[in-house]
C-alpha cells in the first residue's frame, strides 16, 4: 500500500517535470500537433499517477489483493501509453504510436479490475 502511494507520488512529480519540460523547452521546438501529443502523455501520466495514490490509500482499507493487479496495470499503462507518446515526440519514431493503445487498454483494464475487485468484497 505504502509503496503504491510512494510510486504514485514519484510518478506524479515526474509528470510535473515532463509538463514543465514541454511548456518551457519543447514549446518553441515542436509543431503544435507534436506538442499536443506530448501534453496528452503528460495528462494521462498525471491522472494515473493520482490513481496509484488512490489505490495505495484503498489498500489500507481493503486487502492488498484488491489493489495489486489494478495498480500494476495502471503503472504499465503509464509506461506504455505516456512513454510511447513521449518517445514518439522526442525521437520522431512514429511507429511508437502503434503501441500507445496497449497502454490505453492497460489503463482501462486497471480501472475495470478495481471495479470488479471492490464489487467482490
List the model feature ranges, each with a label:
Residues 1-121:
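Polytopic transmembrane helical bundles with strong interfacial aromatic enrichment
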Amino acid at each position: 500500500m505504502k509503496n503504491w502511494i510512494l510510486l504514485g507520488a514519484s510518478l506524479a512529480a515526474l509528470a510535473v517535470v515532463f509538463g514543465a519540460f514541454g511548456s518551457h523547452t519543447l514549446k518553441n521546438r515542436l509543431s503544435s500537433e507534436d506538442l499536443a501529443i506530448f501534453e496528452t502523455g503528460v495528462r494521462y501520466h498525471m491522472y494515473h499517477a493520482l490513481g496509484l495514490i488512490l489505490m495505495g490509500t484503498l489498500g489500507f482499507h481493503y486487502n492488498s489483493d484488491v489493489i495489486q493487479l489494478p495498480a500494476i496495470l495502471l503503472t504499465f499503462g503509464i509506461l506504455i501509453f505516456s512513454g510511447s507518446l513521449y518517445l514518439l515526440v522526442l525521437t520522431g519514431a512514429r511507429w511508437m504510436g502503434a503501441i500507445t493503445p496497449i497502454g490505453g487498454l492497460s489503463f482501462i483494464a486497471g480501472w475495470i479490475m478495481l471495479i470488479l475487485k471492490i464489487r467482490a468484497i
